[in-house]
Design a protein with these regions (language model features):
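Single, function-defining residue in the core of a domain
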Residues: 1-56, 64-65, 69-72, 77-85, ...
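Extracytosolic and intramembrane catalytic regions of membrane-associated proteins
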Residues: 134
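Short Lys/Arg-enriched helix C-cap and helix-to-coil transition segments
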Residues: 89-100, 104
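Conserved beta-strand elements of the Class I
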Residues: 112-114
Length: 423
């Protein structure tokens, strides 16, 4: 197969998934009778329009995509038609697209490699929104914001899963557990920053036989007690802890148990609010396991900056269940650095794919457009991954570095022309 024909496959796949969703459109509409009559623009073209929209006003976006819609459509008619759809249809397309992607790269030829992180998206002020963020200080104005929790494939540069939450109800750990519980891809490694570390998160990963995790830990007094007590030197070892939700057991034993053999940590159980005795090292409000639970994990500590580096941390600590023989300290450091790929992806999603530009202040429309941008991002990055641009003067088969900003612009501008012409 010629490399230039590969992008057509992903576009054809997207179109087939859209057509499949449209075939059962009643499951994704606000009313069962929606789109039952002939309209100026059919629902499949409406969905394509929403996915292909960028940062211009609705009128300009409709004009740019007039060849796609096949007719001139007023902005008001477009909004009315859009209001008949549920965001669920874009979630369905997003999931189906990911399920059907082939030839995915593996880290070390063995693992899918993911990162979990979140990013905020501002929406236009809407006093009726559920996404309003308020302040106790009356001098600060409230605003509307949603938080995108994402599971990102670092090797294939695609968003595998997401959870969209109101900023005022954001729970990144809960979202991470939810996304990992849905993941069925064989063995994988997931990288998370220090805000995700908790005993509940560690244990959820431990009980999943396919899950290998690397979670950055805090290093100061707010870290897990055993980690905060580590000396300032390289360390690579196993820690065993007991986690309990029993206030009685904790208070009776915390002062005299041999801390090197048995470590007791109190967490807030949904049915047991022991805030008075809650360990400062266990600030997770969730515990999804039994009253007494043994938690085991590997701790890796290594230097990242010299002692004289101003205003920089000297040491980094990672919590993991990866084998020390296969992943020694130096390799753990290199592996965790790959997490920055998700930070770069958020920048491209927001600015290259215009993900920060919403065309409505309604909550449902904002969620709909976020899913649409994730779909467009995955399609374009899949095309970039398959593109082959050899350097004409290279003798080592090196390739040109593809300009991703231009790739997003070109695909959005000419997407359906490419699909129709077969270029």
């Amino acid at each position: 197969m010629k490399s230039q024909s590969l992008p057509v496959n992903i576009l054809a796949l997207l179109d087939s998934i859209i057509n499949e969703a449209v075939s059962k459109i009643s499951e994704f509409t606000t009313k069962p009778t929606a789109f039952s009559r002939h309209r100026v623009i059919d629902v499949s073209k409406l969905i394509m329009l929403i996915i292909n929209m960028q940062s211009e006003s609705i009128q300009k976006e409709l004009f740019k995509n007039i060849s796609l819609s096949g007719c001139s459509i007023a902005a008001s008619a477009f909004v009315q038609a859009k209001a008949k759809l549920k965001p669920d249809i874009f979630r369905y397309i997003f999931d189906q697209l990911n399920m059907n992607l082939a030839s995915l790269k593996l880290y070390n030829d063995e693992y899918r490699l993911f990162a979990i992180d979140g990013s905020d998206f501002n929406q236009v002020w809407n006093p009726k929104s559920e996404n309003i963020v308020c302040f106790e200080d009356s001098n600060r104005k409230p605003y509307c914001q949603v938080h995108l929790n994402a599971l990102y494939d670092l090797e294939n540069k695609i968003y595998q899963d997401c959870v969209i939450q109101p900023k005022n109800k954001m729970d990144e750990r809960k979202a991470a557990v939810e996304m990992l519980s849905r993941l069925e891809c064989g063995k994988y490694i997931v990288l998370m920053d220090r805000g995700y570390l908790s005993f509940n998160m560690i244990q959820h990963c431990n009980v999943n036989k396919d899950c290998y995790y690397v979670i950055r830990s805090k290093t100061g007094f707010t870290a897990i007690k055993e980690i905060s007590q580590l000396p300032d030197e390289e360390y690579d070892g196993i820690l065993d802890c007991w986690v309990t939700t029993s206030n009685h057991f904790y208070t009776q034993n915390k002062d005299h148990l041999n801390i090197h053999l048995v470590n007791i940590h109190l967490v807030n159980h949904v049915n047991h609010q022991y805030k008075k005795f809650k360990s400062k090292n266990s600030k997770d409000n969730s515990w999804d396991f039994k009253q007494f639970c043994h938690v085991r994990f590997r701790v890796c500590k290594f230097r990242i900056n010299p002692d004289d580096a101003p205003n920089k941390e000297q040491w980094e600590v990672l919590v993991t269940n990866l084998d020390a023989d296969k992943f020694p300290l130096e390799r753990m450091k290199e592996l965790y650095n790959l997490r920055w790929g998700i930070e770069k992806s958020f920048k491209m999603l927001k600015y290259d794919d215009c993900g920060i530009q919403f065309h409505s202040k309604k909550d449902e429309f904002v969620k709909m457009e976020l899913y649409a941008h994730l779909i467009a991002y995955n399609v374009i990055m899949n095309m970039v991954n398959q593109a082959y641009a050899p350097h004409p003067k290279s003798k080592s088969n090196s390739e040109y570095q593809i300009n991703l900003s231009m790739a997003f612009f070109i695909v959005h501008f000419s997407r359906y022309w490419i699909a129709e012409e077969g270029l």
